Amino acid sequence: MINSIHQRIRFYQKIFLIDCGFLTILAINSLSAQPADLTYSNPIIHTDYSDPDVIRVGDDFYLISSSFSQAPGVPVLHSRNLVNWQIIGYAVPHLPDSIYDLPQPGRGIWAPALRYHNGEYWVYYGDPDLGIFMVKAQNPAGPWEPPVLVKQACGWIDPCPFWDDDGQAYLIHAWAKSRAGFNSILTLHKLSSDGRQILDEGVTVFDGHSTHPTIEGPKFYKRNGYYYIFAPAGGVTNGWQTGLRSKNILGPYEDKIVLEQGTTAINGPHQGAWIETNQGESWFIHFQDKGAYGRILHLQPVEWLNDWPLIGIDLDGNGIGEPVQCFRRPDVDNPISAFQMQTSDEFESNSLGLQWQWRANFKPEWFTLSARSGYLRLFTVNPAPVCYNLGDLPNILTQKFPAEAFTVTTKLSFHPDSNDDQAGLIIIGNDYAALKVTHRGARYQLTYAECTEIEKGKSEIISETVGLNKPEVFLKANVGEGAVCTFSYSTDGEKYLPLGRKFQAVKGKWVGSQIGIFAATTPGKISSGYADFDFFRISTMDKIELK
């Protein structure tokens, strides 16, 4: 009887996937006794929030992700329905080492874990060069306590805490081959009761070399007497999600692939988190690597069969789930939410919007929102001791790409101190393209510049320059399908003229490409110059179509 029910559910799940519009009602009625008539489409967040971890506290869901060397670090997102999210804060405002006062691509905060324990929110994260850190807070929006170094180590990554029923605390983590010399191992340690110290040398609870190479990002849970570890394997681009279970926390652990790409277009469904709603439904949020767009987030239904999770839909009957493109929304008390990810900024507040991050630990003297009402003033500073190209600047203010296709418009007024000062709009990954306002004698000019392989210290190339009659200009970047970008400018905000050529945005080190604004000068120079930005407006294709 149970098998028959499961077969019927899967049958209607398949029908649901064929046409998420026409057959929605049929599928929903078959899949759930709840009167929900809403669906969602993946990705739920088309933005670079890699290595997500998610928890539920009451009716609220909270999500965190990797942030590497950007600051503030460890973004904290909030949702009431697992589909609509907004940023509410950051768990690590400044990274706790001076090396992060300058950009350190690919280093910093890797794969943090979020848990709620004893009335507090706990975040553990690994820095592959420094060790395992912990921060905690009473409120997920902050303030968060300063990072505590739990274990100084090299190559320890992706930590996740777990408190067992008897109160004993544990920490599981993976290994970075680039630092430790090996990977594909999951190691479990006992933790002190305050969560601040590792108490033993650790036990290898799973070796994935033969069956699940590059296993990493473990997340620890307990259900129905089993200890579960959810962990991706096989690599970011083409891997799969592995499920491990054991009746003993130290193992041995059985293993099973619980989510794979299969016949879908969702490559390498990677690291994520299992969540259970108040109604007892199980869901899984994971990332998909999408090149220049970074690691975008998907939401999958979870079905438990014989105490194994089946994530997504088993379309081919091989017992392994495949990602869904669309599905009915989770059965929660707030199926419809006004939450949306922050993007545009009119700079009318006394603080920057939470969507902004700097490329390194930031200094208050880099900017102000109070010098001119309704404007963000970026000062022409350059904290980098050496600056081969704009990629060396820590003081570029950036956002993640918010959608597959979007337009960014900003207006700046440039007030240089010397010919060395510059300000503008940039799209940056391992390569960058920028529109830069500069000053030469009595003339202002706007240039289009590109630079490739910025980490190798290459110089940028200026391919086109136009004169400006005044130091005020509107700048625009259009990002199209496939992250192909074009730039344009306007002197009146109405008529835009193209400048430069088509630019193919590319990913950075472990991150997607980003859009940003900047003001800078040459290294070591003291400048009193600045640029005032009136607004930063983003329009996605969905928003444009609604007009």
Where are these regions (language model features)?
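Intrinsic structural disorder/low-complexity segments
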Residues: 9-10, 16, 32
